[in-house]
């Protein structure tokens, strides 16, 4: 079977679709009446040297720490210890598999750069998109490793700096065109930090052109900080009671911000004042789409075993129409909400059901198009992606366009050894559930 796309990303005019399958990125471009493959990149980095370097550093640290504990002869002379060769640790029997993820695809604001994060070396990878190259549009600019795994990525408003948030709560800002920094902690300090895993990051500008950085974390926090003086906190947006997984800032409003995550609501904020404007409760809407996939882990179940947990995976918007779209992780439904631009109130506008579970969601801002990727494990003949166009005031599936796109995708991936897998070898597709905190995290 073909591996589902873990992530999809459209550029602003919808002419480029970027897809992640396991540890490779594919780029499909609209040409004529269909799509063609215009770029591909595989993360084939061997991280063995990186692991060995860490082992050597740890051995050196232990030698220094234990220097005073060396065995000594009766004369007080230290006993020479045999030197140990650094060995790369290998997972033992029963150890969980190690996946070489590519995650967090993003485009620069001018659409000329593609950003991605790799798990193999905890790096941000930056590509120039060269549409003049008919063979491969991906031109690697730099690969910047970080101390901890990147969780979210964007660029500054002028696209000069890479903004990256990691799983330990630190945010880094680095010039995109500068050389790779070999030792980040020594050469580049974080510009701000949370005391919790960061889940999303974005940038804002006010009417005076001042930049702000917005960060969300696992501990219900949304922080708005000045940029580049990010040590100055402008405000916090308080109201979430569970983790925040996604934040969305529409271009058609100069004050609204939307967020969601482990709560049963989609939140609407005035980011300028910090006011919570509206909470859209989707609890009743989602009930019939929940399955055994949403049962809480056994150790957190009640006696009946019917505790369910679910969360919003992604919110997106469009350029100049007051709608937002979101989906709940591991469900087969996409909700479109209408936004009152003055009050920030949210109301259900459209419900779109699909035969398979949604994995990821993106939008082409300028052409009012949504794109989803689907989990095809239960139906290997289903489309891996679907495009939905706003016609009038409703989103309509573009069946002819989708058929052309899927023909290109299937023919492209037919002989791709990475993309063709057994159903049991599919990478984990749903990650939000692991963000939820239970009693064990508070004890």
Curated annotation (Swiss-Prot):
Disulfide linkage: none
InterPro entries the record matches: Trm82, WD40/YVTN_repeat-like_dom_sf, WD40_repeat_dom_sf, WD40_rpt
Name of protein: tRNA (guanine-N(7)-)-methyltransferase non-catalytic subunit TRM82
Family listed: Belongs to the WD repeat TRM82 family.
WD repeats: 97-137, 193-235, 239-279
HAMAP family referenced in this protein's UniProt entry, alphabetically: TRM82
Function: Required for the formation of N(7)-methylguanine at position 46 (m7G46) in tRNA. In the complex, it is required to stabilize and induce conformational changes of the catalytic subunit.
Keywords, in A-Z order: Nucleus, Repeat, tRNA processing, WD repeat
Pathway noted in the entry: tRNA modification; N(7)-methylguanine-tRNA biosynthesis
Cellular location(s): Nucleus
Native species: Kluyveromyces lactis (strain ATCC 8585 / CBS 2359 / DSM 70799 / NBRC 1267 / NRRL Y-1140 / WM37) (Yeast)
Taxonomic classification: Eukaryota, Fungi, Dikarya, Ascomycota, Saccharomycotina
tRNA processing is among the record's keywords: yes
Subunit structure: Forms a heterodimer with the catalytic subunit TRM8.
UniProt entry tagged with the keyword Protein biosynthesis: no
Region (Disordered): 67-93
One GO term describing the cellular component: nucleus
GO BP: any one term: tRNA (guanine-N7)-methylation
């Amino acid at each position: 079977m073909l591996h589902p796309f873990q992530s999809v990303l459209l550029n602003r005019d919808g002419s480029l679709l970027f897809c992640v399958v396991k540890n490779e990125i594919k780029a499909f471009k609209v040409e004529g009446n269909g799509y063609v493959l215009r770029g591909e990149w595989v993360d084939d980095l061997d991280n063995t040297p990186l692991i060995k370097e860490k082992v050597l550093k740890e051995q050196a640290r232990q030698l220094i720490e234990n220097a005073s504990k060396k065995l000594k002869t009766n004369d007080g002379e230290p006993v020479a210890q045999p030197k140990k060769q650094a060995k790369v640790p290998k997972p033992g029997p029963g150890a969980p598999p190690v996946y070489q993820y590519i995650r967090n695809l993003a485009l620069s604001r001018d659409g000329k750069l593609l950003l991605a994060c790799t798990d193999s070396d905890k790096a941000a990878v930056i590509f120039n998109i060269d549409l003049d190259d008919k063979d491969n549009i991906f031109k690697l600019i730099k690969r910047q490793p970080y101390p901890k795994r990147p969780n979210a990525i964007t660029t500054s408003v002028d696209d000069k700096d890479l903004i990256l948030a990691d799983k330990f709560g630190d945010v880094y800002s680095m010039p995109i065109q500068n050389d790779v920094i070999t030792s980040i902690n020594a050469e580049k300090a974080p510009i701000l930090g949370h005391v919790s895993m960061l889940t999303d990051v974005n940038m804002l500008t006010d009417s005076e052109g001042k930049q702000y950085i917005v960060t969300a974390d696992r501990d219900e926090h949304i922080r708005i900080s000045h940029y580049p003086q990010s040590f100055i906190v402008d405000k916090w947006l308080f109201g979430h009671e569970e983790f925040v997984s996604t934040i969305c800032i529409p271009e058609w409003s100069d004050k609204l911000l939307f967020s969601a995550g482990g709560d049963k609501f989609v939140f609407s904020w005035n980011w300028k004042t910090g006011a919570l404007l509206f909470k859209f409760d989707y609890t009743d809407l989602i009930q019939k789409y929940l399955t055994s996939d949403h049962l809480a882990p056994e150790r957190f179940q009640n006696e009946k075993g019917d505790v369910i947990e679910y969360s919003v995976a992604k919110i997106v918007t469009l350029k100049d129409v007051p709608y937002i779209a979101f989906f709940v992780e591991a469900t087969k439904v996409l909700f479109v909400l209408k936004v009152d631009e003055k009050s920030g109130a949210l109301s259900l506008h459209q419900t779109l059901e699909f035969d398979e579970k949604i994995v990821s969601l993106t939008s082409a801002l300028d052409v009012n198009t949504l794109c989803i990727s689907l989990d095809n494990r239960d139906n290997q003949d289903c489309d891996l992606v679907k495009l939905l166009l706003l016609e009038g005031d409703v989103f309509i599936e573009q069946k002819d366009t989708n058929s052309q796109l899927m023909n290109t995708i299937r023919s492209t991936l037919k002989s791709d050894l990475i993309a063709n897998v057994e159903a049991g070898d599919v990478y984990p597709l749903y990650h939000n559930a692991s963000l939820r905190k239970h009693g064990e995290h508070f004890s």
